[in-house]
A protein has these predicted regions:
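Extended, charge-rich alpha-helical scaffolding segments
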Residues: 2-90
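Short terminal interaction segments
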Residues: 2, 85-153
Length: 153
């Protein structure tokens, strides 16, 4: 059975697996960028930090493009197979030889999502703690000015 551009459903499944693998790799790269971001924040290298933030934006944009391609391919494959465009549905309607790369890619994507979520949480906590410390220092400095002490005498 063939679909768009004379692709067989096996070839379409392979393309879908490749896109999902690319999505996982993009998330893993993004997690690496978040680790670099934390190092740059600690080192106060603001020029490099701005460059890294632009790289993070590109990474997110690339991922969204891959996600749209995944949705398109999954929709086509599901239409050919007569099922919902969910990975579990698609995989259950394919032979094991054809579904294994898809299932493996989906598993890797899930692991990548968990890894990225962990990196976001670590970065978020670091920024929250930094803000709290900054607020504490400012509060202490304000307290000094209200104590009657004057630098001018």
């Amino acid at each position: 059975m063939t679909v768009e551009g004379d692709l067989t459903f096996r070839e379409l499944a392979r393309k879908l697996a490749d896109v999902i693998e690319a999505m996982a790799l993009k998330l893993e790269d993004t997690a690496g960028l978040l680790k670099k971001e934390r190092l740059l924040l600690a080192g106060k290298d603001y020029a490099s930090l701005q460059s890294l933030l632009k790289e993070l934006e590109r990474s997110v944009s690339d991922f969204l493009g891959l996600e749209a391609e995944r949705d398109r391919l999954a929709g086509q494959l599901a239409c050919v197979l007569g099922c919902d465009p969910k990975m579990s549905e698609i995989a259950s309607n394919l032979e094991e030889e054809t579904s294994k790369p898809l299932v493996d890619a989906a598993d890797r994507l899930q692991r990548s999502i968990k890894g990225l979520k962990s990196e976001f949480e670590i970065t978020s906590r670091l920024l929250d703690e930094s803000k709290k410390l900054g607020d504490l220092v400012l509060s202490q400095l304000r307290g000094l000015t209200g104590s009657g002490f004057s630098v001018r005498g």
